[in-house]
Every structure is written in structure tokens, then in C-alpha cells.
Amino acid sequence: MYNNYIFDLYGTLIDINTDEWNDDLWKKIAILYAYKGAHYTYDELNEEYDRLVQAEKKAVLKKSPDTKVVDIKIEKVFRKLFTQKGVKVTKAEVLFIAEAFRCYSTKYIKLYDGVLDLLDTLKANGKKVYLLSNAQRSFTENELNMFDLTKYFDGICISSDEECSKPDEKYFKTLFDRYGLEKSESIMIGNDYISDIGGAADFGIDSLYIHQSISPEIDGELRSTYKVMDGDVFKIKKLIINHS
């Protein structure tokens, strides 16, 4: 019997399309930096952003060499883009840049059909619901709130907080240790056959794979216990709730 249902977020509960390589995005962000006195051309800003992201990843790996799949706190990058131009900013100003970046880069965002029904059913049946997401808190917290999803979760892990991502077993262990979960009572639900499903298999828990349009192409073994290949969230209940 499953008592703990662990969800991926993007591509599983939330359908999202973003474009972080669009010139218009970087032109707008460059204007916001210029408002505070940090002047960049848009292509310079894009290049510096990419460079600082890689530098942050190296710094995390140096600090935690046992981490196999690194994540970073993107706010550090946005702050450094100010400081290397000699501009001091507050935490709130950095957060605003992060939120603007996410907003300008998002082409659409919505819940998949059936998500609220699924979560309501889990809670009505006394199940525990957890989030294990490869994401940035400065992006994800707002998006959880906009869809009123936070109330459903008994625990939330966001990779930027831990500086570690799926499919790293270390990240799965963080969730299980923090909330005292048993592997035999837990199942991972996600749309990425490597990060979600491969990670769950390596960690030793069951999983359900749901294929969505933004899912990476499956190139190898799909190691899930269950699968929904047509993206129909409503089918999840029949597979892993009614028979749990």
C-alpha cells in the first residue's frame, strides 16, 4: 500500500513552456538592470549570466564533491550581475529580478487537466503528498501559490535549496530523511524517464511515469512500475490509488 505520493512539478502537475534564450527577454532584463545603474548590452548580460551559472555550479561541486547532479541558487547569479558592475542591491531587489526573468521567459503556464481532482482524491483518502522538484525557489514558490497547490503538500523539497537535483539519490534521501518516509510505502510520479523514474529506481522506490509533450524523449529503458503514455492525469487514480 502506498501512503506517500511524491510528485515532480513541471511536466507532471504544471504544464509550462519557457524560453530563456529569446533576445527580447534579455533586452527587458538588461533594462531592469540599467534602472539600478548596472549597464549591460543584452548579449553581454546573457553571456555573463551563462558564465556565472557555470561558476556557481563549480563552486557547489567544490563545496559538496559527493553531489552527482548539482543545482544552484539562481539569486546568487542575479546578485553578482549587479555587484560586478559596482551596484549594491537588497534581497528584495534581487528577488524582483528573478521573478521578472521567470515572468518574461514564460510563454504559458497552466495545470494539467485532472491535477486538482488527483490531489483532492489523495487527501480525501488520507494519503501524504510530497513535492520533489528540480526547480528554483524564487520561481516555483510563486507558481505553487498562483495555482493554490501549496496546501496539498505535506512536505516540499526544491533543488535550488538543496543545491542537488534528481536523479541524484542524495536528493531523494534528503526528502525521505526530512519527513521520515519509508521506501516500501512511497511512489514517485513524474514525466522524466531519467530524473524522476531512473532516480526513483536507483533509490529503490516504485514510480509512475506519465508522458507529456515536454517529456524528454525516452532513449533507453523506462524503469517505472506503472506508466501513462498519453498524458491523461485522470488515469493515475486507477493505477496507484484505487489499488493501493
Feature names for model-found ranges:
Residues 1-5, 15-19, 36, 40-43, ...:
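Asp-based, Mg2+/Mn2+-dependent phosphohydrolase catalytic module
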Residues 31-35, 105, 160:
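A short acidic, glycine-rich active-site loop
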Residues 69-76, 91, 103-130, 141:
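Short, acidic loop-to-helix structural element flanking the phosphoryl-transfer center
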Residues 30, 43-99:
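A metal-dependent, Asp-based hydrolase signature
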Residues 18, 66, 70, 103, ...:
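Pocket-edge positions in alpha/beta enzyme catalytic cores
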Residues 20-33:
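Basic, amphipathic juxtamembrane/active-site segments
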Residues 8:
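Short, acidic, Ser/Thr-enriched surface-loop or helix-capping motifs
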